[in-house]
Amino acid sequence: MHPPAAGRPETIDETAAIVTARGGRGIAVRVDHTEPEQVASLFERVGELDILVNDIWGGDDLIEWGKRLWETKLEDGLLLVDRALKTHIITSHYGLPRLRTGGLVVEVTDGDGFYYRGHFFYDLVKTTVIRMAFALSQELKDRGITAVAVTPGFLRSEWMLDHFGVTEANWRDAVERVPEFIASETPLLLGRCVAALAADPLVASKNGRVFASWDLADEYGVDDADGTRPHFVRWLAANMPEVAAGMKRADDGLYAYWGEMPYRTPG
């Protein structure tokens, strides 16, 4: 079994308790999602599904920012593919047969476009996850199941708070060093956006596409834990326009090139 990514102190039991505290029923199950047998066993226990969210990452300690492919540690790059892409494939393989008609598949990525993300393996994983949602939308449409990809903005995760040496209580102290952190969001915002997608009777109209938390929050009227509604790209456009200009989101022009092959391959 792989060790916990980046040695994080948080536990699955704590996560389950948070789910229960918010009105759900959190059930902690220890599973290594790189191991097909463990994932298969998990879904045998679960039974039927209404929604499947693939959000496994585990790459914070594997990215060598500023280095090109041939300069990176190959073993770290391949491990990142195992953790952040292979896990999604394995989980979908065993989970998708259990989705009910009208169900929803959500792939969580970083960014809602196909611009270069600054590192070969990071870019490979995050753009492939978007494409996975599209491919699944094609394979699931005859079952009445919708597949989308979603991205948070500047995520104020536990790892990021530790990285900047702050907590959720005083996170604004990091803004002087990292101005764009003022537009950050907690993981709760994207979770609320996913819940809104799952409750939308017209969610099938979004099939196969990628959506950002800031756009979904505006569309569904969703706020973050503190009642604010962060809009990362809007902040960038106002304060770092040269950065925002390079973050072109996937639009109708791009999707016009995506579609099912007009023929079937032999066999």
State what each model feature region is.
Residues M1-E48, W57-R68, R249, W258-G267:
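Short-chain dehydrogenase/reductase
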Residues A149, A169-G267:
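C-terminal helical subdomain
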Residues G24-R25, E48-L49, R98-G111, D142-T146:
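Active-site loop of short-chain dehydrogenase/reductase
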Residues D13-A17, A21-G24, F164-P179:
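A short C-terminal helix-loop "cap" of Rossmann-like NAD(P)-dependent dehydrogenase/epimerase domains
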